[in-house]
Amino acid sequence: MKLEQLLEGVPFTLAQGSLDTEISDIIYDSRKAAPGLLFVCIVGTQRDSHEFAADCAAKGVSALVIQHDIDLSAMPGVTVVKVESSRYAMALMSANLFGNPSRQMTMIGVTGTKGKTTTTHMIKSVLEAAGRKVGMIGTNGIYYMGRHKETANTTPESYELQKTFREFLDAGCDTALMEVSSQGLMMDRVAGVHYDVGVFTNLSPDHIGPGEHKTFEEYRSWKGQLFQRCDVGVVNIDDENTEALLEGHTCKLVTYGRSEQADYRASGYELLRTHDFLGVKFHVTGKDEMDVKVNMPGEFSVYNALAALAVGKVLGLPDQAIHDGLGKCVVKGRVELVPISKKFTILLDYAHNEVSTESLLTTLRAYNPHRLVVVFGCGGNRSKLRRYGMGEICAKMADFSILTEDNNRFEKVEDIIADIRVGMNKGNPEAKFVEIPDRLDALHYAVDHAQEGDLIAVIGKGHETYRDRQGVKTPFLERELLEEYAQQKGLE
């Protein structure tokens, strides 16, 4: 593709060279530099890849995209284009390179602090029940037409995102559904993508700190950007941040919640529990009337299901498809039951901070278990505040806690547990807990010491398939490990 075609829609200045330059692909990793490629110089939080421009030129790249001036004297044969934002330029160029695939599918984006993953899975289930062919991108990976790939970020870099959209389209997908993170919006990963439907779940303080957002207000503002890039916004009317988040929105709004003002509102919800089932059923009124049953527990599942229902209605899907899709949806690693015993209930969940842990435990407590037991750790090389917070919440809300490892990365598990212990002692000096550094041993302990009617939540890893010790990732699939142990023990 000619560079001029690649730059369509991108404001730029030609610093040197020719727009007739032929480009075979786009890269932003200097280690991949080779003839025929265009290297995008990105200013990152850790490194500025303009430092590698000369090296890439020496390796024969055909063109460079720069954001600030560099010494061009050592690269006379390379075409150089200057832009205001190299991330924004890369997003639009990537879309052009892959033929703007997002324009040829129904596009749905979901944002919020909690519930993005579950809501996207529910929407996918509803769409597929209606016969749609869906590609989905999010925290749990990329799914389309029976295939699955892992992702490094909730919202992939723009090049990978556009490449994935192309794969969706070529595989026969008619709809692309994705989690849209605040980082993805702020870093222009979704620049140039227009959504048919944008969804807002809820908002609470998160992702605030070095390399992320400076303030909660900034975080909220970036989340709100989605509603300036979609035709219809499906939003939680009950969230206290909704009005501020929607400031400057350009889309039509459809609301959901428990408020009387909601377009789709839930009433009369009932908790359902057996040893191998935790769920909820409720009635929907407003613009439509329907009974809904969901295979996931708690009030937050009601909100997630309402969001999916509203999206289905916006897209004109049949009520039966919405009902059936919600009824059969199960999300890997999100309040995922592992039915290994009739004596107790054990589940896996990705809750890995104070907010999500409190929300989960509040939900589970409502089912009145004999004991609420939590198995958890915290990630290494991350904020100590998260450890204190999770420890404090579990001490207050759980009957018994098993402190163990999560992804230790380059820290000692004993040091991480010591920080969690500080939070435990603050939350409840009388809290009952045990420390078992090896997570597999902790899982075995939880099963061995389970009592009749216990509800055991294994939190922090959820859908993850590995554990990280000293930067080395080894396979660790909690569901399989629990099932294997139950089989060894002969549990019923």
Where are the model-predicted features located?
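N-terminal leader/targeting and accessory segments in enzymes
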Residues: 1-92, 262, 269-270, 293, ...
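Phosphate-binding loop of NTP-binding sites
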Residues: 7-10, 89-237, 241-249, 306, ...
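Structural beta-sheet core signal
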Residues: 136, 178, 198, 235, ...
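Short, well-ordered alpha-helix to beta-strand connector turns
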Residues: 23, 35-36, 61, 77-78, ...
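Short internal beta-strands
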Residues: 62-68, 233-237, 375-376, 399-406
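Short glycine-rich anion-binding loops that position phosphate/pyrophosphate groups of nucleotides
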Residues: 44-46, 182-183, 204-207, 239-240, ...
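Acidic, Mg2+-coordinating active-site environments of NTP-dependent enzymes
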Residues: 9, 70-76, 171, 196-346, ...
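ATP-dependent carboxylate-amine ligase
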Residues: 1-14, 35-38, 250, 287, ...
